[in-house]
Curated annotation (Swiss-Prot):
UniProt xrefs under PANTHER family: BETA-DEFENSIN 123, BETA-DEFENSIN 123-RELATED
Keyword Protein transport: no
Source domain of life: Eukaryota
Protein's name according to its UniProt entry: Beta-defensin 132
Keyword line: Antibiotic, Antimicrobial, Defensin, Disulfide bond, Secreted, Signal
Function description: Has antibacterial activity.
Stretch list, region Disordered: 76-95
Predominant subcellular localization, coarse grouping: secreted
Family to which this protein belongs: Belongs to the beta-defensin family.
Length: 95
């Protein structure tokens, strides 16, 4: 019984001492990432912390790409307008 209590006390102490971030230290102060040898699934490396460790940041912290939505429709509508103008010019020239 005393041995079981000793084991439980040791495990409780170890949970306080061992870091929960898988051994990774924080990157630069403003970066929401951790320095690791390999990035976890769902993370990408932004820069190197040192020669062997990368600053791994979760995809959820990265900015989304800001692309215009109607690029394809815009060019199709412009193409139709030029074809209509060409047809009008052809009819006026031939008559």
């Amino acid at each position: 019984m005393n041995f079981l209590l000793l084991v439980l006390a040791a495990l409780g102490f170890l949970t306080q001492v061992i870091p929960a971030s898988a051994g990774g230290s924080k990157c630069v102060s403003n970066t929401p990432g951790y320095c690791r040898t390999y990035c976890h699934w769902g993370e990408t490396a932004l820069f190197m912390c040192n020669a062997s460790r990368k600053c791994c940041v979760s995809y959820s912290f990265l900015p989304k790409a800001d692309l215009p939505r109607l690029i394809g429709n815009h060019w199709q509508s412009r193409r139709r307008n030029t074809q209509r103008k060409d047809k009008k010019q052809q009819t006026t020239v031939t008559s």
